[in-house]
């Protein structure tokens, strides 16, 4: 298995749903060896209905290596894999068992990081066509438009119910992850608001992340630190949160993006026009001992770009490459 603790701070091409010639060439032409997959909507590579199987995971990792790439992490099983566990519904123990099997299979296949979230209804936006710099299109969120949205489930769910379900889940999963040698990386709620459609969103603040790390207290449990989601919470908390968690070795990888504005209203942005000085973010990660990988994550939709936003991703990764070179030289 890839020893993530022995590698330097580095860039990765991320949010891939499949490994194809386009993705391979994109990474190689940018000089990036490390990659990450996001399987939130499923994937041709990992076709399971309840869990991911060992041979499928092994084939994916081997295909990456055959292409000269290193598979660092997979994030987000399809939410149907564990929605009963998230809501504490009948059948949650069976779903937890399937998730345990998935993590065991990832370990056997030599995939070191599994990124996950606890956002029952996923990512919410109220617009996908807001205009950013130069007419590029970005997603945006305005809490006023959805604060009273109808229930997405049969009833409301409180903070403490969701915390109880999270505690039950993570304490069942972590021992398996430790045994399998897999690191679990928790992503914030996006948007980080108190509730949506009657369901509490608990991974929304610095204090709540401290609580989550205390509940799941293990060297194999840490953060997928999404800078954009933390910036949505409060731009002023981003650097203190990095110092706190990175100094403890709790940041396993980073979604390196930003937004303009904070909850209750924000829009996504190019990497150099958001709330934060992203070079200071990169420098703080380095100074705090972070040695994981950084990926570009969400990017604006530039004119005449591909469906995967190759132009916009290349712009973001180019900016990130220069920042990383500068912090390494210093």
Regions inferred by a protein language model and the residue ranges of each:
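Histidine-acidic metal/acid-base catalytic patches
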Residues: 1-10, 17-21, 26-28, 62-66, ...
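Residue-level "edge-of-site" marker
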Residues: 17, 40, 77, 119, ...
């Amino acid at each position: 298995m890839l020893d993530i603790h022995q590698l330097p701070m580095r860039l990765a091409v991320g949010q891939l749903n499949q490994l194809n010639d386009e993705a391979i060439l994109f990474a190689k032409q940018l000089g990036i060896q490390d990659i990450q997959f996001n399987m939130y909507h499923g994937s041709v590579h990992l076709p399971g209905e309840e869990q991911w199987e060992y041979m499928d995971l092994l084939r994916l990792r081997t295909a990456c290596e055959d292409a000269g790439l290193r598979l660092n992490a997979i994030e987000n099983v399809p939410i149907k894999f564990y929605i009963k566990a998230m809501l504490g519904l009948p059948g949650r123990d069976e779903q937890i068992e399937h998730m345990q099997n998935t993590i065991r299979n990832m370990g056997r296949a030599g995939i070191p990081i599994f990124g996950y979230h606890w956002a029952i209804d996923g990512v919410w936006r109220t617009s996908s066509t807001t205009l950013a710099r130069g007419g590029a299109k970005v997603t945006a969120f305005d809490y006023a438009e959805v604060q009273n949205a109808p229930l997405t489930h049969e009833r409301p769910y409180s903070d403490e119910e969701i915390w109880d379900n999270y505690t039950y889940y993570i304490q069942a999963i972590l021992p398996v992850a430790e045994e399998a040698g897999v690191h679990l990386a928790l992503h914030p709620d996006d948007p980080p608001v108190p509730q949506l459609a009657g369901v509490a969103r608990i991974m929304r603040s610095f204090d709540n992340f401290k609580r989550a790390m205390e509940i799941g207290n293990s060297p194999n449990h840490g953060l997928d630190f999404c800078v954009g989601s933390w910036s949505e919470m409060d731009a002023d908390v981003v650097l203190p949160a990095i110092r706190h968690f990175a100094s403890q070795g709790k940041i396993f990888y980073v979604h390196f993006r930003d937004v303009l504005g904070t909850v209750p209203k924000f829009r996504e942005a190019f990497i150099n026009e958001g709330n934060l000085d992203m070079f200071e973010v990169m420098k703080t990660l380095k100074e705090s001992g972070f040695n994981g990988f950084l990926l570009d994550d969400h990017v604006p939709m530039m004119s005449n770009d591909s469906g995967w936003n190759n132009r916009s991703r290349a712009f973001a990764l180019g900016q990130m490459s220069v920042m990383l070179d500068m912090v390494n030289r210093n």
